[in-house]
Design a protein with these regions (language model features):
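Enrichment for repetitive, rod-forming helical segments
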Residues: 9-13, 76, 197
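Acidic/proline-rich low-complexity IDRs
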Residues: 10-13, 83, 203
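A transmembrane-helix-recognition feature enriched in membrane-embedded lipid enzymes
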Residues: 178-204
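Short linear elements at protein peripheries
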Residues: 201-220
Length: 220
């Protein structure tokens, strides 16, 4: 009876230990790649600022979380002139993160050649994989909330991209942050495993030179 009980306890505890161990690895491997804004100028030859997409509102406008990412990405662009890569889910006609991101960015005076769209950033992994293999990016800044940066940076490092993370936590939203932190633990574990096998993204396509004009990526 005791052996059975120990086995049951082990079967319950072991998966929990694995989940949190992998999460710990992802966080620890990435935390020193998160930089402050006053460190940006010290990093040279950056190919792009990757702004990762997320939920849009029912009316098609960016959610508060996405707006924060876009504001931070725009702020860095205005300081550095480094090209923007806006990557999100545009998998259906009725759901379009990417053009919502573009419209937000283009609400200010900006050179259209400097704004690139990736319509097939269906996941964090897809966005970063395509940044390397479609857009030819070797070195980049990644803009998203801190909880998300650990995973994004871990994926980038695993794929051989020199990436630095910049937080987009411009406005406090603790309730949203806590909910996403819980989901993120499992997402980190999933992408930890994915980076071992390094599958290609769901959708590839023709290569796009990030040093060229972003207008070629516009569909509207």
């Amino acid at each position: 009876m005791k052996k059975k009980l120990l086995l049951i306890i082990s079967l319950i505890i072991l998966p929990i230990v694995i989940v949190f161990t992998l999460n710990f690895i992802v966080v620890k491997k990435s935390e020193d790649r998160i930089i402050k804004e006053d460190e940006i100028d010290a990093i040279s030859d950056v190919d792009a600022i990757l702004v990762l997409g997320c939920k849009v509102n029912p009316d098609g406008s960016p959610s508060m979380m996405l707006s924060n990412r876009l504001e931070k990405g725009l702020e860095i662009y205005q300081k550095t002139g480094i090209k923007l890569l806006l990557s999100g889910d545009h998998g259906t006609k009725d759901y379009d993160e990417v053009n919502a991101m573009k419209d937000y960015i283009l609400s200010v005076d900006i050179n259209l050649d400097d704004v690139f769209l990736d319509h097939a950033g269906f996941s964090t992994y897809d966005s970063i994989y395509r940044a390397k293999y479609i857009f030819g990016i070797k070195k980049m800044f990644i803009v998203t909330q801190r909880y998300h940066l650990y995973r994004a940076l871990y994926i980038a490092n695993s794929l051989g991209i020199e990436a630095y993370g910049i937080e987009a936590d411009n406005i406090p939203y603790k309730a949203i942050n806590t909910k996403n932190e819980i989901r993120e633990v499992l997402a980190r574990d999933k992408d930890f495993v994915k980076t071992i096998f390094k599958p290609s993204s769901k959708l590839l396509g023709e290569e796009i030179d990030i040093k060229g004009s972003g207008r070629l990526t516009f569909d509207k």
